[in-house]
Curated annotation (Swiss-Prot):
The active site is at K74, S149, S173. It comes from Prochlorococcus marinus (strain MIT 9303). Its EC number is 6.3.5.7. Disulfide bonds: none annotated. This is Glutamyl-tRNA(Gln) amidotransferase subunit A.
Amino acid sequence: MAIAEWRQQLKLGEVSARELIDHQLARIAVVDPTLHAFLDVTAERARADADRIDEALAAGESLPPLAGVPLAIKDNLCTKGIRTTCSSRMLETFVPPYESTVTERLWQAGAVLLGKTNLDEFAMGSSTETSAFGATSNPWDISRVPGGSSGGSAAAVAAGECMAALGSDTGGSIRQPASFCGVVGLKPTYGRVSRWGLVAFASSLDQVGPFTTNVADAAELLQVIAGSDPRDSTCLNVAVPDYCSALSQPMSGVRIGLIRECFDQNGLDAQVKSTVLEAAEKLQSLGAELVEVSCPRFSDGIATYYVIAPSEASANLARYDGVKYGYRAEGADALAAMTARSRAEGFGSEVQRRILIGTYALSAGYMDAYYKKAQQVRTLIRQDFDAAFQTVDVLLTPTSPTTAFQVGAHADDPLAMYLADLLTIPANLAGLPAISLPCGFDDDGLPIGVQLIANVLEESRLLQVAFHYEQSANVMTNHPQGNFIP
């Protein structure tokens, strides 16, 4: 059910907020023992919030735009009084004393929290397998991963456990799991949405965005969470347009660029490539003009990212020392030993690996060769995008080189895991808005996602193109049944 449809049913009294929340909680009880999308379910709070909405409606009060909409929140966004773990032993018992800006705005808009979702530890991963509390399964085939790091949110939306969810995207952590799970995932422009209350991974790359079952719902959620925030100095102080009204703008005259370097990748699955190109042709049939463009340094994004992101992570995660909060090792007889043991026991292997990479890249003898060089390449990647947007309105690529892979397939091969984000990372490095939406299925019945990238603050254009494609293609109304959780 779309948010607009739910709003109408609630207003007409066809379904109460409590009935919807009870339905969602029952769905979670049936499905989540298999999926493990949720770390915590806030059933008591959800029912109480739903009852308040029903009481307000009965009293004739006007309702906020997301009244009664059941949401899940990635567990690296702080929720006051509710455990926020980042799927790490380091924060297993951490209960924030404050609310993140994005969740605060959602509750003010009437949304109802169903619970907190699983993720790769501290958002570092592409499969949700690095969670300290167990992996999440893909609803389309439980032997496969849902993607990451926001795999819990993507899986929850795909399996109908919630109407929508929030995730965070540092190098593709919303878009890649959206592709793997057959849902819509939107990463806004860097600074379009506040990061206040998002537990930091890589501060110059992190951005919060929604998972939904359709593009219109993504526009509705972005409308609520976007906007300036004095508590986040990187948040842009620019007006928020009406994203929903932009959806129906005509496609005629829209120029869509196909990035040559993306379709020439050696690791690009043939079915993914052909399906995404069919999506491009569908957009052409709707009035868009297709143009081949070149972003010569697009493929350099992954090497650049795996210097910059771990460097920022090594600084951000230095605060977890076992002294003020977080996991503290027992039995250490000195402060240095306690800190070292707390980090060794509290952080998982992937987080430790990235801290080591980042610390090395920032060390005195290597900073110029690695970190500063990576920042220079980042600038060049941004310049390539700037040049492309001189001739086109939106860029089109596959979201991921492959469909969802088997659980454990890349467990012993970090490089193979990192390559899953090959096509999503450049948008983060350039701070651009990007969206993944379903465009078809492979021979195994697994979803394939197409990625659209727009220029800075051009979310309206991005959503417009995505909406027209979605309405014309009807991909998710014709999906194969396969192993999909009923």
